């Protein structure tokens, strides 16, 4: 007889498997650890090609692939009210207690949070990215975020820098924002049993080759380092628009034998690439957090990274060499890293990472945020409208109208299909221990 | 050097764009309102004779709003069309389905176990767990 689940969490985002990225990994690992703590977790995302409908995944994680077409960069088109019926049905079927939205750029997340608040559910939001304040896209995105978070219970950011950024952009009270970092599965990212020799120093780069990840910096840094240190070679994993520039750099400086381009690296193969190196190079121009350097440090690599966003918070000072996002400074940082490389002990570094970052710890801290959200008092529609009104002279009134209409539509749905008429989905109890699964298999055979 | 220049001029450029943008919008709004509301006689009396038909002052906003509404209806209809039929196999399998892979089958006691990689659980097993009273206990 399984214990009744403590909490029933709905994770909402446009980004989930089969898409790959930091947000997708975060949602998956967090869900797995929450399931192990005894909670029930359901994920809601949009359909990916033929992957549509309901799926059950590892650990009994139920995923709703809502048939909603992505519009741009895997984000759905904002319809404001279009998702209200399906969100209501899912919340009711799964008897959800907390709705957890992920990523500021996810349309589905913002709409689901809005509808959940209208229906009186507790909502938590996690922001995974940094945004600027001065370009047209950021200005509009910040206004949407202000609307979406004006009425939220609790928010989570992945670094202190990210928290400052989110608080400034959305006008959210800092007391409502928790800092819970990303983590790394240290059991998966272990150092090589035999460390590669330092006669040839290998520097590993694994990231998407796009502007935001600083691929243009690599084009200038790699030839300079190769010129200064004949015994250095590079391994570059990842694909993207800047791939051609890096290939041109290899041709131009005749570095075909010293710079290896791997192309896209599946996440399951990242460790086998990392353990071949001594130094990990991260050249991002903006990062709220950087899971890649966590994975590298867990594998025992010394990290060289640009000093941007939340990166300085990620690792202790003796595990990372920071540089400004400038080719000359990055070359100097790599020189410094090479000079301190003999003092690095990969096994010791891995053990420290095991203590510093683990998804189990992230899940426990998220649990605290959920409990805090559940303690927040329920607010009537009028109180919520007051909050929206304070968002701006014109925007506030517009937000109020949007919310009033949302409330009326919800009432209309209740009239057309009362809550009692929505069938509740049965729960499953999936055993996590391998031994019990085997016995279940035997029991099936007995039948 | 190039990045240094960008740093020096970047914020100012953004501020200039913002300032010019806001002033332009205010001026454009005033002109639009004058065009839409001031009678023809007054405009002609101060020498303004040539301007687009006032009809468009009403038509353009209405066209835009109706286009947006129709686009929303179209998008939601498109989503309904893309919904799989109840009998479709895509509700069970698809291009991205993954079998459960048990790597690291030999686990020593006390050794850390990685979080299981993402994979699908077969629907028959879910049905057994959900509805078979024996296994539910």
UniProtKB/Swiss-Prot annotation, chain A:
Q: Which UniProt keywords apply?
A: Endoplasmic reticulum, Glycosyltransferase, GPI-anchor biosynthesis, Membrane, Transferase, Transmembrane, Transmembrane helix
Membrane topology term reads: Single-pass membrane protein
Instruction: Give the top-level enzyme category.
Output: transferase
From the record, give the transmembrane residue ranges.
388-408
Reactions catalysed, as given in the entry? a 1,2-diacyl-sn-glycero-3-phospho-(1D-myo-inositol) + UDP-N-acetyl-alpha-D-glucosamine = a 6-(N-acetyl-alpha-D-glucosaminyl)-1-(1,2-diacyl-sn-glycero-3-phospho)-1D-myo-inositol + UDP + H(+)
Q: GO molecular function terms here?
A: phosphatidylinositol N-acetylglucosaminyltransferase activity
Q: Which residues lie on this side of the membrane: Cytoplasmic?
A: 1-387
Lipid biosynthesis keyword on record: no
InterPro entries found in the cross-reference section:
Glyco_trans_1 (IPR001296), PIG-A/GPI3 (IPR039507), PIGA_GPI_anchor_biosynthesis (IPR013234)
| Tissue expr | Expressed in roots, stems, leaves, flowers and pollen grains.
- Where it mainly occurs, coarsely classed, is endoplasmic reticulum
EC number(s): the record gives 2.4.1.198
| Record's keyword annotation contains RNA-binding | no
Top-level division of the source organism's lineage? Eukaryota
Its BP terms in the Gene Ontology are:
GPI anchor biosynthetic process; pollen germination; pollen tube growth
Disruption of the gene: reported phenotype: Defective in pollen germination and pollen tube growth.
Q: Which residues lie on this side of the membrane: Lumenal?
A: 409-447
Q: Which GO terms describe its cellular component?
A: glycosylphosphatidylinositol-N-acetylglucosaminyltransferase (GPI-GnT) complex
Q: In which pathway does it act?
A: Glycolipid biosynthesis; glycosylphosphatidylinositol-anchor biosynthesis
Supply the PANTHER family for this chain: N-ACETYLGLUCOSAMINYL-PHOSPHATIDYLINOSITOL BIOSYNTHETIC PROTEIN, PHOSPHATIDYLINOSITOL N-ACETYLGLUCOSAMINYLTRANSFERASE SUBUNIT A
Protein's job: Necessary for the synthesis of N-acetylglucosaminyl-phosphatidylinositol, the very early intermediate in GPI-anchor biosynthesis. Required for pollen germination and pollen tube growth.
**Sequence similarity:** Belongs to the glycosyltransferase group 1 family. Glycosyltransferase 4 subfamily.
Task: Please state what the protein is called.
Answer: Phosphatidylinositol N-acetylglucosaminyltransferase subunit A
Organism listed in the record:
Arabidopsis thaliana
Q: What is the lineage of its organism?
A: Eukaryota, Viridiplantae, Streptophyta, Embryophyta, Tracheophyta
Q: Encoded by which gene? A: PIGA
Curated annotation (Swiss-Prot), chain B:
This protein's UniProt keywords: Glycosyltransferase, GPI-anchor biosynthesis, Membrane, Transferase, Transmembrane, Transmembrane helix
Q: Which domain of life is it from?
A: Eukaryota
Catalytic reactions on record: a 1,2-diacyl-sn-glycero-3-phospho-(1D-myo-inositol) + UDP-N-acetyl-alpha-D-glucosamine = a 6-(N-acetyl-alpha-D-glucosaminyl)-1-(1,2-diacyl-sn-glycero-3-phospho)-1D-myo-inositol + UDP + H(+)
Instruction: Show the stretches that span the lipid bilayer.
Output: 16-36, 58-78
Identify the Pfam families for this entry: PIG-P (PF08510)
State its Enzyme Commission number(s): 2.4.1.198
Major localization listed first in the record, in broad terms: membrane
Q: What is this protein called?
A: Phosphatidylinositol N-acetylglucosaminyltransferase subunit P
The species is Arabidopsis thaliana (Mouse-ear cress)
């Amino acid at each position: 007889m399984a214990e009744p689940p403590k909490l029933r969490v709905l994770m909402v985002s446009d980004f989930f498997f089969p898409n790959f990225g930091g947000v997708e990994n975060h949602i998956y690992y967090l869900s797995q650890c929450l399931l192990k703590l005894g909670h029930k977790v359901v994920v809601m995302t949009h359909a990916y090609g033929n992957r549509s409908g309901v799926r059950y995944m590892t650990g009994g994680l139920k995923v709703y692939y809502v048939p909603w077409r992505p519009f741009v960069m895997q984000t759905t088109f904002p319809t404001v009210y279009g998702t209200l019926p399906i969100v209501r049905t899912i919340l009711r079927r799964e008897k959800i207690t907390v709705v957890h939205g992920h990523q500021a750029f996810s349309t589905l997340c913002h709409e689901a949070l809005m509808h959940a608040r209208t229906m009186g559910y507790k909502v938590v939001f996690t922001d995974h990215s940094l945004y600027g304040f001065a370009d047209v896209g950021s200005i509009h995105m910040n206004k949407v975020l202000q609307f979406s978070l004006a009425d939220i219970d609790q928010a989570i950011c992945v670094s202190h820098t990210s928290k400052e950024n989110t608080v400034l952009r959305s006008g959210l009270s800092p007391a409502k924002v928790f800092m819970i970092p990303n983590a790394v599965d240290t059991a998966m990212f272990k150092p090589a049993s035999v460390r590669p020799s330092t006669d040839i120093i290998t520097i590993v780069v694994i990231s998407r080759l796009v502007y935001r990840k600083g691929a243009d910096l690599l084009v200038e840094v790699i030839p300079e380092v190769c010129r200064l240190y004949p015994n250095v070679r590079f391994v570059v994993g990842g694909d993207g628009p800047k791939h051609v520039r890096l290939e041109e750099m290899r041709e131009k400086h005749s570095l075909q034998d010293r710079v290896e381009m791997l192309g896209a690296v599946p996440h399951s193969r990242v460790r086998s690439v990392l353990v071949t190196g001594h130094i990990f190079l991260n050249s991002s121009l903006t990062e709220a957090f950087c899971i890649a350097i966590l994975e590298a440090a867990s594998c025992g690599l010394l990290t060289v990274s640009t000093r941007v966003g939340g990166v300085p918070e990620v690792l202790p000072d003796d595990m990372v060499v920071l540089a400004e996002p400038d080719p000359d400074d990055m070359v100097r940082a790599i020189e410094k890293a090479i000079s301190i490389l003999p003092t690095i002990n990969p096994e010791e570094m891995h053990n420290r990472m095991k203590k510093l970052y683990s998804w189990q710890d992230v899940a426990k801290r998220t649990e605290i945020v959920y409990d805090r959200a559940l303690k927040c008092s329920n607010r009537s529609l009028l109180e919520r409208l007051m909050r929206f009104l304070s968002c701006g002279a014109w925007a506030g009134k517009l937000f109020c109208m949007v919310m009033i209409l949302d409330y009326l539509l919800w009432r209309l749905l209740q009239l057309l299909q009362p809550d009692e008429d929505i069938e509740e989905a049965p729960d499953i109890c999936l055993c996590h221990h391998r031994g019990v699964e085997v016995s279940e298999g035997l029991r099936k055979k007995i039948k | 050097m190039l990045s240094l220049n960008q740093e020096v001029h970047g914020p100012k450029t953004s501020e200039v764009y913002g300032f010019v943008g806001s002033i332009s919008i205010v001026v454009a709004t005033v002109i639009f309102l004058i065009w839409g509301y001031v009678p023809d006689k007054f405009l002609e009396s101060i020498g303004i004779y040539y301007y687009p038909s006032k009809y468009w002052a009403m038509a353009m906003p209405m066209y835009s709003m109706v286009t947006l509404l129709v686009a929303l209806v179209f998008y939601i209809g498109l989503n309904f069309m893309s919904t799989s039929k109840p009998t479709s196999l895509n509700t069970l399998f698809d291009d991205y389905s993954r079998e459960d892979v048990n790597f690291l089958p030999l686990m020593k006691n006390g050794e850390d176990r990685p979080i299981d990689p993402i994979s699908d659980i077969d629907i028959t097993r879910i049905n057994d767990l959900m509805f078979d009273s024996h296994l539910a206990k």
